[in-house]
Amino acid sequence: MASVVSLAGTLGLLLVSALPEVLGDRRSPDRRAHPGDAGQVGPAAAEPRRQSPPSKNQRERARSGALPLGALYTAAAVAFVLYKCLQQGKDEAAVLQEEADKKDSLQSEQHLAQLTQQLVQTEQHLNSLMAQLDPLFERVTTLAGAQQELLHMKLQTIHQLLQDSKPNKGVEVPEPEASIPFLEDFCIEEDEEEAGDNQAWEEPLNWNTGTRNLTPPREMQPTLRRRCRKSAAQGLSHSPHWKEGKTVDGLVKQSLFL
């Protein structure tokens, strides 16, 4: 705004200074033609000149000589002022553009600083979360490893027990259970033997009757059966195959219930 006012003032001063030259001094052509004849012209001669007004042609000639110079001067002054105004306007536009660029760059730097600060805060939050989750990850990993080891040990134990329960190739395989007599068979055989012995001692043998009656009396049968069961149970308890089967079954059940 101040630059515009100064330019307007400069233009006004130039126009005011150009006005006298445009108008000029309208002196008579006699004075212009004979400026040094002051002595020849006396007061008497000056009176008629003063009294006679200048002609119209003389005025037009004076104006036509003065106008082109003043117009050229004024046009040059106006052109110079306009040039200065345009140049100053360009300079002001460049200055404004530089200020706008500086302001934009400053805003960009501030925005970048804010983003950097937010990124640092986010990184700190992530680090704190990872620090809280690390113990949980370690516990889960430890528990998973322990469970895996325990399961592996159980599988190895079961496999070993199954291998131990199988008969070896170099050892003779015992006869099936059908070859082992039942408790009642032992009891019946012993009853028959004892009854036969008692009858042999008490009664004479009758070889003519064909077969002997080895059945013991009814009063002695319960006692004989109890004794047979006890002796059979003791014999089976001393059997190595029975002990091995029992221990293997017990170990398998125990490992499965762990």
Swiss-Prot record:
Keywords: Coiled coil, Membrane, Signal, Transmembrane, Transmembrane helix. Residues 106-134 form a coiled coil. It is found in: Membrane. One of its GO terms (cellular component) is membrane. The keyword Transmembrane applies. Residues 25-35 have a biased composition (Basic and acidic residues). Its main location: membrane. It is a single-pass membrane protein. The keyword Coiled coil applies. The chain crosses the membrane at residues 66-86. Residues 1-24 form the signal peptide. Residues 25-63, 203-222 are annotated as: Disordered. It comes from the Eukaryota. PANTHER family: COILED-COIL DOMAIN-CONTAINING PROTEIN 107 (PTHR37345:SF1). This is Coiled-coil domain-containing protein 107. The gene is CCDC107.
